[in-house]
Amino acid sequence: MPSFNFLKEAKVYIIYSGNQYNIDISSVSFSQTFTENSYSVKTLHNQKNVFDGSIINKANPANFEFTFPAIKDSDFVTVFNLLVDYEGFTNKLNTFDLYISTELDVFKIETCVITNGSFVIEKSRPLSLTVSGEASKLSYFGAKSDVTIPGSVQSRSATMRYNTNPVVTATLDSQALSNIVNVAVELQNDIEWNPYTTVHQALQVTSANNAMYPTDFVLKNRVLSGSIQRYVTERKGTIGASSNALALQSWDTSAPIVITAGEGSGGSFRGFSFDGNCSFTNRLGTGSVFTQSHDWRLIDNPTNLSSIISYTTGA
């Protein structure tokens, strides 16, 4: 009877700076495709050759995505840092290798870079973070019983402490927002892979083993944005008014924004926080209950983005 790889058995390991981090996940996906080019094989003497030939010598960047819980302990903070931080004093993002292991097989994804991070902030649901990205190469590493995932294994906390009932607060343009329905925050890292195809390399390709794979990239742009959805109540607010509700259908090109999502307060706070300056627009939503959404985008350019976004953990 054949053995199978089951998603529910999948475990994710990040290898970064020689260390191995086991990341608990609720979902994971990964893939890589190859570019196929066709060419005509029809000739004057073979008019029935109407099916084109094929050339495959180039791999597209691999893709991956996984979701992990934003617990109160520091077990998974490395993933957050890989999303946010630069590589040293450069403007490049950090790269890492990813291993996905089932009870049967192990798969390896090389030179990974996180291109998107979606902060899952919902009332009555534990905080979590979904990251997705691109990579150089996906390959089969081997049978689990035959291979060893590299890296110095990092210890884990004895118990997992979840942010099970996060308290969400938001201040926009120095006004505390009430009647919040939900909050969405997303960080996008726009990268572009350097050209990696040459005529010489193309002529040498004989299989997926020596195909042309992307190797390096540049960071083109970063966008931190989100929305704060609230119920429309009797307190509408007016433009320029010092109330706790901003005006409907208003906007601003420069306003301070502070969002926190987590448990505890002061030095005991554990969770996500966002503190910077943004532009925003306000739009009305006409569902069964009327809502308004403040759609915002960061306009600051800090030396370190971690001064704007933080994931606070601790005992």
PLM features per residue range, with description:
Residues 1-315:
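Signature of extracytoplasmic/envelope-associated structural regions
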